[in-house]
Amino acid sequence: KREQKYQCPNHKIFISPSTFEYETEQENLLWYDSADKNLYSEIKKVKRESRIARDNSEDALTWNVMRFLDRQGLLADFLSQLSNKKITESELILWSYSPKEKSDWTLLNQARVEFGETIARGSEPDIIIRTNKVLYFIEAKLTANNETTPSEVDNRKKYETGGNKLFQQIFKSDYETVAEKRYELMRFWLLGSWMAKQLKLDFEFYSLVMQSRELEIEATFGKHITETTKRKFSRLTWEQIYAFIKLLPDNKEKHIMTEYFENKTIGYNNSIGTIIKAFNV
């Protein structure tokens, strides 16, 4: 709780049983110059939930890593290596916010409506990257996992009927089977596939996790979906992104980023009083 009795008098952080929280969100963000500040404030207008001041915040991690790649003009190079395709143009859309449109992305809102969601409470991918060849969806996880279930079991929206019954074309399993454990991944696979089709782009969907987590996610979700050369689901690790950054020419921002990865923590083990290291780097 953000109460004075839980606040460290020296460091001003708030202590909880499993993690700590900075006094301000800015303290947990590596990039916060005027351009970043403006972008972040615009994102917050469309982003629904944020615990970005917490040490174990996947949103803060997502911002720090993806903004680094974007600021340095490295997204296209990273994605080219990831996909083995020549990516030359990219727009980074974090938590639905399109910098080009200066609002939540119109096409994403169209997809939400197409599949019976409301725009205000529709699916919100962490990371979308629109490029010249591929539409990327990246669902970022830090301490959470990809096991999700519907909050309203009987409200199937139009997931099975929208997009000219696209569900039947891109899933091997029925709605109940996928939604039982992989509801969030199901929605992103469905909406992303539809959006890529409108843009006439390939679709690549990545589950971004720590190297030590969810080793079987490609198999456990992959068995439910129909993949093609133009529509793929893959596991990606934060450590793979670190390895890409580590090989870059040295500069100040690269040094900040590699140190961040090497020292990142995800709270602490309260029973033995030790800090938990996030990454295997």
Report residues per predicted region.
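Charged, terminal alpha-helix-loop-beta segments
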Residues: K1-V281
